[in-house]
Amino acid sequence: QANRYRFLQRTQTASAPGKDFQTWDLPRLFAEIEKQLVMALASAETLKKIPVSDFDALLVKGNVPDSYRPTMYDFLAHEALAFYNSGEQAAARSQAAFDLSADSPVFSDTAQFLAWKPDSKDDASPQLKAIRLYQQLLGFHAKDDDRSAWLDVDLLRMNFGKNFSFGEEKDARYKAALKRFAEAHADHPISSRALYHQATVVRGEGELVAARKIALQGKNRFPNSVGGRQCHNLIAEIEAPTVNISTERVWNDPLPVIDVRYRNLTKVYFRVIQYDWKQRLTNRGSRRPDYMDNKERRVLINQKPVVEWSADLPATADYHEARQEIPARAGLKPGSYFLLSSHNEDFSEQNNRVHVCDFWVSDLALVIRNRNGQG
């Protein structure tokens, strides 16, 4: 992946490739990868009898037990799926190109998905090859006592449908499939993963309260599972307090307001720090507030404020961003200032983000009007 740009710049040639794969173009490289995967999976019946644990010394284990990939067939089949689902090996589309419709059985129950025989002559389609692999894996694990591998594949083919299908009903069918899966397999940790994906879709639709409720169900069901932790993180993102401020660059009578955009907060704290504009102008390392790094922010936070105060904010029960206008502080002497905001009273860096903007207090202001781009 790091050297992808090198391969993209190469022109496809008709001559046979040399032994050094670093000189190949992308189509040739992908063709060779697929060739090796197909050759490996040709021995499927043998691979199905080889426990993946036999190769522990060679494989980098993930965060799930071997029951999710119990055999070398599972390992190689999922490697092939990762290849087909990457989208990198897409070639020029033929007239008979396979298109995955959202109203196809890709989101139907498992029995309908297994019975599905896509009507397509596009044998080169990566999506078509992936569908067949999902079906083969589901058939292989259909009678397993441990349902982990079977359930994992069933959930993955739904995610595959979400990523590659088209149609207005895609999200609705995907959500329905995830809900059906989570309810039918509520006694297995994988159901928390399904709830996480369902909550993610609902969140993307702007229904944050509903998304949090679904994610909380997944977290409480299996808190230490992969899906449980994903749900925990999603809830944390939805509940995360945020605040951003902006104001006029020049404060004079009548005083402007501080525009506060926030969520999951009921109070915001302000500090005003005075600075020497001449010194800052001659210091090449000085940057505008939007581009300050943590070190520069820390220096500001540690300075004694000219004034500090707080303002109450209406609660955001729906977790969406709200906006309030807070009156600017009166009584400041003419000069240059930084305005800092925080949702922690002590302006600490832990679980907090300090926002900074700059302004002047002056009786004068310069208004520039552009006329047809001439200034």
Where are the language model's segments positioned?
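N-terminal, cleavable Sec-dependent signal peptides of secreted/periplasmic/extracellular proteins
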Residues: Q1-G375
